[in-house]
């Protein structure tokens, strides 16, 4: 009887309200506009989303974007204690590696040759805010994730990326759009060493997961898409509004729930916040110079630099680091 009663409860009792149709249509359009060669979004196409994020008073958990081919959707909001220009200085400089500013989520990333952002980034970084006219650029990004907090899996994939910098009622707003054109590589086993907040991760080339009874599973990210709006709040801070969809699992099944996506966004933003809000954060130019220096080192020098870290890892015996795959 209890099961029957639960089954006939109105859908509104268990689901968040849908977004207004103009907002959904605008999100759909932006995701379709992400690949290079597509028409640039007109300012009017962005207005429904900007109207919504600046006027919405509902808690993020009470807002639910419609499901898409890329999976279930969530809405999430964060506020960063720094102006948009400073965020852009790190996010839109191709010389700054993603792993330096998103350490909790990105193992490594790179813009592929031919990406518009490789030649356009300077226009964004030096633009007057808000800009007199919208600025648009695109690119194709290669990305590898850090190990998942549950399964230990990490993935690699390509993303179509779209950036639009615009003026909204005298406030600068940056749209960051991503859409995965195909599924990811098969999930490989990694592990988090100690507390995830320490950003210490190890990686193997072994397929599978760290989950009990599911070590054999060959998992994939089947779909991923996002529309993020960064907008100045008028007090020197920047609001970030995330619309995110994801689908992942094995043998074609999807095991991702909205709560998993929200947890992933919180993990992503926690790393970004700690790096960017820290008074000790180096400038984009300093990070780029250090990264270039690392790339110029030979293998022997890199191994020497990493020897203390390797010794630290060798002293760890927590599961699953005692397994052969993590000791090679």
Q: Which positions does each model-derived feature cover?
A:
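Bacterial N-terminal signal peptides
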Residues: 1-10
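Terminal "cap-and-tail" regions of soluble proteins that handle hydrophobic small molecules
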Residues: 15-328
